[in-house]
């Protein structure tokens, strides 16, 4: 089968769907020129493929090597329906490429009059200069130039030249497609790993920042007592299910090193510059999580969990909490598969009871409805996002576990929280597990909250 980039270019929707259904495929990877599958589908006008990629979570504002977004390509090739679709999904209408051109520069230059009108109607700036001091309207033929100026003025735009600044995108994050070769290696040679700095050490092992094949990675070395052939076999069998590349809100395990030859069983995953949601909320990173960012994180997590809940069988021993959610370079929250416990890791022990549903603390895993229990954990994450506090921070894990399970200890919702979030939290934290919603039911609610 041809590669995914060819299938997207040619509009082979059936082949693209089959490729997307394989969880080991990463739809946000790039080719040699940094074109993602979405870039190619937008450039060639493949509407059905564009729709499919967006619905599966393709990044809308991803940039190729020349900093063109999919909107730049759709606009320059006059694919009006695709331009509309990208704008509907919040494409950055004034995204600047390496020459300082925005999508409107290209629509004007290539004579895509209708696309240019659509862009201006949606807020594209007619007077923004590129690196060479040219405005989009400078590129347009005279009749279109006058029309666009008139439209922009009606919409309240100031028609004075906006000089090019190298800082146009400084407040935003530039998202590049990921290296597509990373998901090809499941077994990794331990000797190829370059260890740069130890990040953390706890009961379950050591966490290191490293490099592998020119990429920044995180290396997780598991501490396992009495390593045996049987545990080694379980490790080999359980690892492949954690290599989920097909959803943007799930962070896959890239690969693993068996022990021996590695000193310990080892997992490799993508380096996340902001660390975990716990780091971002409680350990003073550089950016502020305002209400709209909090809703976006909640939506990201709900989408990731909705996807994981479609898998049959469910991935066992996955615990949802703020330490097991990672924050990507473009502020996307991703459920970390490297935090899933293996069958041989401390069975029966709970290390983050503050996020665990009461029934999961009281019963054996096989007697608990995992999907409902995950929804409770999500409600605690919502509480954490709006309060910026660690749940039950003044108690030990042992006390939390006992009090939540036996004494009805619950997070208290402080006054002043948005009534919508408050209501959602209460629904997700219903004492009756059977009455809690499913993740695919709360995704649309969070989408509405985001739009507001």
UniProtKB/Swiss-Prot annotation:
InterPro entries per UniProt: Ankyrin_rpt, Ankyrin_rpt-contain_sf, Kinase-like_dom_sf, PK_ILK, Prot_kinase_dom, Ser-Thr/Tyr_kinase_cat_dom, Ser/Thr_Kinases-Pseudokinases
Record keywords: Acetylation, ANK repeat, ATP-binding, Cell junction, Cell membrane, Cell projection, Cytoplasm, Cytoskeleton, Magnesium, Membrane, Metal-binding, Nucleotide-binding, Nucleus, Phosphoprotein, Repeat
Membrane topology reported for the UniProt record: Peripheral membrane protein
Residues that bind ATP: 200, 202-204, 270, 272, 279, 341
Domain of life (superkingdom): Eukaryota
Comment text on domains: The kinase domain is likely to have lost catalytic activity but retains ATP-binding activity. ATP structurally stabilizes the kinase domain and promotes stability of binding to PARVA as well as focal adhesion stability.
Function: Scaffold protein which mediates protein-protein interactions during a range of cellular events including focal adhesion assembly, cell adhesion and cell migration. Regulates integrin-mediated signal transduction by contributing to inside-out integrin activation.
The protein, known as: Scaffold protein ILK
Provenance organism: Bos taurus (Bovine)
Organism classification: Eukaryota, Metazoa, Chordata, Craniata, Vertebrata
């Amino acid at each position: 089968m041809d590669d995914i980039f060819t299938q997207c270019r040619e509009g082979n929707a059936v082949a693209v769907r089959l490729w997307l259904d394989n969880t080991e495929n990463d739809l946000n990877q790039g080719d040699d020129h940094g074109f993602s599958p979405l870039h190619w589908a937008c450039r060639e006008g493949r509407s059905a493929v564009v729709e499919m990629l967006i619905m599966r979570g393709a990044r809308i504002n991803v940039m190729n090597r020349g900093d063109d977004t999919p909107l730049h390509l759709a606009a320059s090739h006059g694919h009006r329906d695709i331009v509309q679709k990208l704008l509907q999904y919040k494409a950055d209408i004034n995204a600047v490429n390496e020459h300082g051109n925005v999508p409107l520069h290209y629509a004007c230059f290539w004579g895509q009059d209708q696309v240019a009108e659509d862009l201006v109607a949606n807020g594209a700036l007619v007077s923004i200069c590129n690196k060479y001091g040219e405005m989009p309207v400078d590129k347009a033929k005279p009749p279109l130039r006058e029309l666009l100026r008139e439209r922009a003025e009606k919409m309240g735009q100031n028609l004075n030249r906006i000089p090019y600044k190298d800082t146009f995108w400084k407040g935003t994050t530039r998202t590049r497609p990921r290296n597509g070769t990373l998901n090809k290696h499941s077994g990794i040679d331990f000797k190829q790993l370059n260890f740069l700095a130890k990040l953390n050490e706890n009961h379950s092992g050591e966490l290191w920042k490293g490099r592998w094949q020119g990429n920044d990675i995180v290396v997780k070395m598991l501490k396992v007592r009495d390593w045996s052939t049987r545990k080694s076999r379980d490790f080999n069998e359980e690892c492949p299910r954690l290599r989920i590349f097909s959803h943007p809100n799930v962070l896959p395990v890239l690969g693993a090193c068996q022990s021996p030859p590695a000193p310990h069983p080892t997992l490799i995953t993508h380096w996340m510059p902001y660390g975990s949601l716990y780091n971002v909320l409680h350990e003073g990173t550089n950016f502020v999580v305002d209400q709209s960012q909090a809703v976006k994180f909640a939506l990201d997590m709900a989408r990731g969990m909705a996807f994981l809940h479609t898998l049959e069988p469910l991935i066992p021993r996955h615990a949802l909490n703020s330490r097991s959610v990672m924050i990507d370079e473009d502020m996307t929250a991703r459920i970390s598969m490297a935090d899933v416990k293996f069958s041989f890791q401390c069975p029966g022990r709970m290390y983050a009871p503050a996020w665990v549903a009461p029934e999961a603390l009281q019963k054996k895993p096989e007697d608990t409805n995992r999907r409902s229990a995950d929804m409770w954990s999500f409600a605690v994450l919502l509480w954490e996002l709006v309060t910026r506090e660690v749940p039950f921070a003044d108690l030990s894990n042992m006390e939390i576990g006992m009090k939540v399970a036996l004494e009805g200890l619950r997070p208290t919702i402080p006054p002043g929280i948005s009534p919508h979030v408050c209501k959602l939290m209460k629904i997700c934290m219903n004492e009756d597990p059977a009455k809690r919603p499913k993740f695919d039911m709360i995704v649309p609610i969070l989408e509405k909250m985001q739009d507001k």
